[in-house]
């Protein structure tokens, strides 16, 4: 049976030549996205009026992509997969990148469809499609997040039990490996089969693709609106209009990749010592439970607010329109947790 034990030297040591090549490929692909997005705009710079309007929309599309990278669901998916791959003794390089690429595929394809059909579809028809997609995505999100929070609550309880054993002087190294390997929805449901499925960073592409089908966030809806507006103007070709979703993808992939690399570094550092690893995972698992329940609760309020008897929940449900800000808070919390643990680790020997 394949062991899930991590080799600290491999995970915490210098990057191998293969890992550096993979990282260079990821960075190169992100650069190409930026170049394509800008080049499609520059190709129409001969028309000052049209190019000027597209430039403003392009900057906004890029910023929307950056905002979307900090969505709470992005951070949760990337964090969980990064941890899983490290448990398998592999240092992931492109988890965030391939997740963003899967997500971006949906955005680019739908933006193309919107651009091609902008003149044929009415505003009412577009709003109807958006409403149905948003409802389905919300139900899926509530179900997924509730299950994740429930499973992680069990793991958190087990980790707290291990912490009490440590304080009592017990050796928990083997138990810690077992408890941490239970984390994550698919790991708990599929067991070792999930570990066989997630072998490389590129396996996050279909995950990002599926999670992008809802297109329920304000960033994506705004991008599609920009695309439709540019297409209906009649002054730009489809190729030029596609610069908007490409710039959106460039911004999102840049920061999703940065997030996965940071979490790889943070978890690699924590895995070098069992006690450090236990404390770090208690903090991050607890945060996952709280965030999952909070987001699911907001989505439930948003659904119920459509019913007359629950109209008072509308202000709470409206929070779902600003989940990017929650993503910023989650990212900041993980950074502060890692920084605090790092400082504590440096100060601890001095106290002893």
Curated annotation (Swiss-Prot):
From which organism does this entry originate?
Answer: Rhodococcus rhodochrous
One GO term in the molecular function aspect is: nickel cation transmembrane transporter activity
Biological classification of the source: Bacteria, Bacillati, Actinomycetota, Actinomycetes, Mycobacteriales
Cited function? Mediates energy-dependent uptake of cobalt ions into the cell. Can also transport nickel ions, but cobalt is the preferred substrate.
One Pfam match: NicO
Membrane spanning stretches: 23-43, 46-66, 95-115, 131-151, 206-226, 230-250, 290-310, 323-343
UniProt KW keywords:
Cell membrane, Cobalt, Cobalt transport, Ion transport, Membrane, Nickel, Nickel transport, Transmembrane, Transmembrane helix, Transport
Activity control note = Cobalt uptake is inhibited by uncouplers (CCCP and 3,5-di-tert-butyl-4-hydroxybenzylidenemalononitrile) and by the addition of excess nickel.
Q: A GO biological process this protein is involved in?
A: cobalt ion transport
- What is the top-level taxon of the source organism? Bacteria
The family assignment reads:
Belongs to the NiCoT transporter (TC 2.A.52) family.
Topology term for the membrane = Multi-pass membrane protein
> What's the name of the protein?
Cobalt transport protein NhlF
InterPro entries reported in the protein's UniProt record: Ni/Co_transpt (IPR004688), Ni/Co_transpt_high_affinity (IPR011541)
Q: Where in the cell is it found?
A: Cell membrane
Q: Name one GO cellular component term.
A: plasma membrane
């Amino acid at each position: 049976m394949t062991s899930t034990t991590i080799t600290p030297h491999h995970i915490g040591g210098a990057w191998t030549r293969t890992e550096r090549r993979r990282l260079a490929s990821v960075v190169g692909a992100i650069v190409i996205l930026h170049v394509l997005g800008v080049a499609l705009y520059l190709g129409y710079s001969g028309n000052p009026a049209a190019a000027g309007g597209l430039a403003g929309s392009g900057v906004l599309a890029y910023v929307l992509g950056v905002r979307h990278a900090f969505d709470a669901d992005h951070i949760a998916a990337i964090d969980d997969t990064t941890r899983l791959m490290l448990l398998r003794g592999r240092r992931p390089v492109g988890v965030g990148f391939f997740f963003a690429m899967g997500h971006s595929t949906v955005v680019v394809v739908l933006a193309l469809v919107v651009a091609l059909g902008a003149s044929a579809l009415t505003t009412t028809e577009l709003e109807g499609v958006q409403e149905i997609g948003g409802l389905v995505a919300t139900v899926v999100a509530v179900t997924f997040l509730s299950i994740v929070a429930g499973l992680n609550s069990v793991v958190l309880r087990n980790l707290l039990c291990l912490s009490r054993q440590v304080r009592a002087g017990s050796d928990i190294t083997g138990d810690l490996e077992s408890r941490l390997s239970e984390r994550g929805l698919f790991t708990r449901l599929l067991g070792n089969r999930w570990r066989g499925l997630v072998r490389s960073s590129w396996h996050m592409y279909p995950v990002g693709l599926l999670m992008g089908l809802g297109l329920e966030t304000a960033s994506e809806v705004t991008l599609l609106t920009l695309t439709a507006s540019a297409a209906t103007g009649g002054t730009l070709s489809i190729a030029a209009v596609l610069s908007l979703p490409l710039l959106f993808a460039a911004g999102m992939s840049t920061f999703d990749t940065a997030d996965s690399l940071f979490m790889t570094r943070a978890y690699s550092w924590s895995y070098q010592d069992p006690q450090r690893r236990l404390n770090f995972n208690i903090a991050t698992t607890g945060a996952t439970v709280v965030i999952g329940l909070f987001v699911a609760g907001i989505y439930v309020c948003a659904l119920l607010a459509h019913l007359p008897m629950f109209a008072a929940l509308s202000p709470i449900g409206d929070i779902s329109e600003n989940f990017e800000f929650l993503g910023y808070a989650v990212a900041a919390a993980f950074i502060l947790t890692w920084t605090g643990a790092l400082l504590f680790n440096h100060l601890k020997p001095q106290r002893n």
